């Protein structure tokens, strides 16, 4: 089972701008990294800029309904110490409402309880887990059937620091309580080291945590409403627990409203379920350890995104994060993208597919998009933003275009040969991106190349993507890119390093 949550140690020595952090400060920094607020640099991964930590703290405080100061105050520390779910917090940035991560293509699901916690009588624990499913079927047209053996859509298990069920181990009592996979993987894991209870304020309430994780398994992300079941932090036992309106709205957005019961023989008009359209043949969920990438992007807040088919995941020093439907994060964006690029200069994210381009600011599409590509060839291979000249590069075949986002770029001399500027990289790259220090990465097949600030491939490349980026178990490394080799060359092409003084409308 490939369990895809983000995990980091809490006592690793780190530095901020060369200053060693004490153990009292390490946990908050790792917390921000673990739950998606702070991205560790890929290169020199023990260095953080103070402004990055301040921005991450502000985002966490805003999401936690705390006073937003960007400072590590007592209230922020206390919030970080609260037990919580192990899934990241990619909140819905468009509104404060629920976040949808995917859905099952059926409404009758089976579940299997593989084992039970030792702190509760078996019948009590089993009843709590069953009630967790009932909470959702009470408000949505879903039915659940428990099976005692064989395959099941959703599988629940308790395990600790070492387990064959999941490669991501738990951390002992407190902190991370449970985690789950999104549809249609169906795994729900609970930390067996927790003191699981029912009907008491002591310990951790099993029914509430189980209902939260089943919500993830059904396709719901975290909610920014602190009283919602799908809030990331466990708020304690609630004797008269019921779903928050945001929880209900989220599950009904996925599966429709539960039809009212028709009493006697009276005819009652029922509202048709409002279910988002789902592709008839969605692309299969990729394996980050073996999939060839469609696109890579260093996005806002320093988060690295990898794209394949209809799915996207974040990449950190801990490996791949959870998989999300592309359209769940960027509403209106299709899968199977050709290229993706984020520009810190303009805060714009551009996605390319076929002869169209989409532009987003964070997770909100800009008005008037998508637009048709008129002056650049369709079906691009890759795109990247280079911080040293603040321009966007677009790649197709053996050529590239250099684009100033804030000026009407003269493309009459483009495309120019890739090998003339980027020495030692392949034609037709499948993905590309740059790092904050000016290094550039090209991806093709199972391998990648790293270029220095002079845009020349460094020694020792290409290297394996799965091992060095996704941190998967070592496999036989094939360093031959798919389709032809390249000839390093340097023709002295000069980069355009001038920036436009005023913003103008760009015709794509």
From Swiss-Prot:
<feature type="short sequence motif" description="Cysteine switch">
    <location>
        <begin position="83"/>
        <end position="90"/>
    </location>
</feature>
<keyword id="KW-0677">Repeat</keyword>
<dbReference type="GO" id="GO:0030574">
    <property type="term" value="P:collagen catabolic process"/>
</dbReference>
<keyword id="KW-0964">Secreted</keyword>
<dbReference type="GO" id="GO:0004222">
    <property type="term" value="F:metalloendopeptidase activity"/>
</dbReference>
<dbReference type="InterPro" id="IPR033739">
    <property type="entry name" value="M10A_MMP"/>
</dbReference>
<dbReference type="InterPro" id="IPR021190">
    <property type="entry name" value="Pept_M10A"/>
</dbReference>
<keyword id="KW-0479">Metal-binding</keyword>
<keyword id="KW-0177">Collagen degradation</keyword>
<dbReference type="GO" id="GO:0022617">
    <property type="term" value="P:extracellular matrix disassembly"/>
</dbReference>
<dbReference type="InterPro" id="IPR002477">
    <property type="entry name" value="Peptidoglycan-bd-like"/>
</dbReference>
<feature type="repeat" description="Hemopexin 3">
    <location>
        <begin position="381"/>
        <end position="425"/>
    </location>
</feature>
<dbReference type="GO" id="GO:0030154">
    <property type="term" value="P:cell differentiation"/>
</dbReference>
<keyword id="KW-0221">Differentiation</keyword>
<keyword id="KW-0732">Signal</keyword>
<feature type="region of interest" description="Disordered">
    <location>
        <begin position="262"/>
        <end position="288"/>
    </location>
</feature>
<feature type="repeat" description="Hemopexin 1">
    <location>
        <begin position="286"/>
        <end position="333"/>
    </location>
</feature>
<keyword id="KW-0217">Developmental protein</keyword>
<feature type="disulfide bond">
    <location>
        <begin position="289"/>
        <end position="472"/>
    </location>
</feature>
<dbReference type="Pfam" id="PF00413">
    <property type="entry name" value="Peptidase_M10"/>
</dbReference>
<dbReference type="GO" id="GO:0001554">
    <property type="term" value="P:luteolysis"/>
</dbReference>
<dbReference type="GO" id="GO:0001525">
    <property type="term" value="P:angiogenesis"/>
</dbReference>
<dbReference type="InterPro" id="IPR001818">
    <property type="entry name" value="Pept_M10_metallopeptidase"/>
</dbReference>
<feature type="binding site" description="in inhibited form">
    <location>
        <position position="85"/>
    </location>
    <ligand>
        <name>Zn(2+)</name>
    </ligand>
</feature>
<feature type="binding site">
    <location>
        <position position="222"/>
    </location>
    <ligand>
        <name>Zn(2+)</name>
    </ligand>
</feature>
<dbReference type="GO" id="GO:0009725">
    <property type="term" value="P:response to hormone"/>
</dbReference>
<dbReference type="InterPro" id="IPR024079">
    <property type="entry name" value="MetalloPept_cat_dom_sf"/>
</dbReference>
<dbReference type="GO" id="GO:0001541">
    <property type="term" value="P:ovarian follicle development"/>
</dbReference>
<comment type="function">
    <text>Endopeptidase that degrades various components of the extracellular matrix, such as aggrecan and cartilage oligomeric matrix protein (comp), during development, haemostasis and pathological conditions (arthritic disease). May also play a role in neovascularization or angiogenesis. Hydrolyzes collagen type IV, laminin, nidogen, nascin-C isoform, fibronectin, and type I gelatin.</text>
</comment>
<keyword id="KW-0482">Metalloprotease</keyword>
<keyword id="KW-0862">Zinc</keyword>
<keyword id="KW-0865">Zymogen</keyword>
<dbReference type="Pfam" id="PF01471">
    <property type="entry name" value="PG_binding_1"/>
</dbReference>
<dbReference type="GO" id="GO:0005576">
    <property type="term" value="C:extracellular region"/>
</dbReference>
<feature type="compositionally biased region" description="Pro residues">
    <location>
        <begin position="274"/>
        <end position="287"/>
    </location>
</feature>
<feature type="glycosylation site" description="N-linked (GlcNAc...) asparagine">
    <location>
        <position position="464"/>
    </location>
</feature>
<dbReference type="InterPro" id="IPR000585">
    <property type="entry name" value="Hemopexin-like_dom"/>
</dbReference>
<keyword id="KW-0272">Extracellular matrix</keyword>
<feature type="binding site">
    <location>
        <position position="212"/>
    </location>
    <ligand>
        <name>Zn(2+)</name>
    </ligand>
</feature>
<keyword id="KW-0645">Protease</keyword>
<dbReference type="GO" id="GO:0008270">
    <property type="term" value="F:zinc ion binding"/>
</dbReference>
<dbReference type="GO" id="GO:0031012">
    <property type="term" value="C:extracellular matrix"/>
</dbReference>
């Amino acid at each position: 089972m490939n369990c895809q949550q983000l995990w980091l140690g809490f006592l690793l020595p780190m530095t901020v701008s060369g200053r060693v952090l004490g153990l009292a400060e390490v946990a908050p920094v790792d917390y921000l990294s673990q739950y998606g607020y702070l991205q560790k640099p890929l290169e020199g991964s023990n260095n953080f800029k103070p402004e990055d930590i301040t921005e991450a703290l502000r985002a966490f405080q805003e999401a936690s309904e705390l006073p937003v100061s960007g400072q590590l105050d007592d209230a922020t520390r206390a919030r970080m110490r609260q037990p919580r779910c192990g899934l990241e917090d990619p909140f819905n940035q468009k509104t404060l409402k629920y976040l949808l991560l995917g859905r099952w293509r059926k409404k009758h699901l089976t579940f299997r309880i593989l084992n039970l916690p030792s702190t509760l009588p078996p019948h009590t624990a089993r009843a709590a887990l069953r009630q967790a499913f009932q909470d959702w079927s009470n408000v949505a047209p879903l039915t659940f059937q428990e099976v005692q053996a064989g395959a099941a859509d959703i599988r629940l298990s308790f395990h600790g620091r070492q387990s064959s069920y999941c490669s991501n181990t738990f951390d002992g009592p407190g902190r991370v309580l449970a985690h789950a996979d999104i549809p249609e993987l169906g795994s729900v894991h609970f930390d067996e080291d927790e003191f699981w209870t029912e009907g008491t304020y002591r310990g951790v309430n099993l029914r509430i945590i189980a209902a939260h994780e089943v919500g993830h398994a059904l396709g719901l992300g975290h909610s920014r409403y602190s009283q919602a079941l799908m809030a990331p932090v466990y708020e304690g036992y609630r004797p008269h627990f019921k779903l928050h309106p945001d929880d209900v709205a989220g599950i009904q957005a996925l599966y429709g409203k539960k039809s009212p019961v028709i009493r006697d023989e009276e005819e009652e008009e029922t509202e048709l379920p409002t279910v988002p359209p789902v592709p008839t043949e969605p692309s299969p969920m990729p394996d980050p350890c073996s999939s060839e990438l469609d696109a890579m992007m260093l996005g806002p807040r320093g988060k690295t995104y990898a794209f394949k088919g209809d799915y996207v995941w974040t990449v950190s020093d801990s490996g791949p994060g959870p998989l999300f439907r592309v359209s769940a994060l960027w509403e209106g964006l299709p899968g199977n993208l050709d290229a993706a690029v984020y520009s810190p200069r303009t805060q714009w994210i551009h996605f390319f597919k076929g002869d169209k381009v989409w532009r987003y600011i964070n997770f909100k599409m800009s008005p008037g998009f998508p637009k048709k590509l008129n002056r650049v060839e369709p079906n691009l291979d890759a795109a990247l933003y280079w911080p040293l000249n603040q321009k966007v590069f677009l790649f197709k075949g053996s050529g590239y275009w250099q684009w100033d986002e804030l000026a009407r770029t003269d493309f009459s001399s483009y495309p120019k040969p890739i090998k003339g500027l980027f020495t030692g990289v392949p034609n037709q790259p499948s993905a590309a991106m740059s790092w904050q220090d000016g290094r550039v990465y090209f991806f093709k097949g199972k391998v990648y190349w790293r270029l220095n600030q002079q845009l020349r491939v460094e020694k020792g490349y290409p290297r394996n993507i799965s091992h060095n980026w996704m941190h998967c178990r070592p496999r036989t490394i094939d360093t031959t890119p798919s389709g032809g080799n390249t000839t390093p060359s340097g023709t002295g092409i000069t980069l355009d390093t001038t920036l436009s003084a005023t913003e103008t409308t760009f015709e794509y």
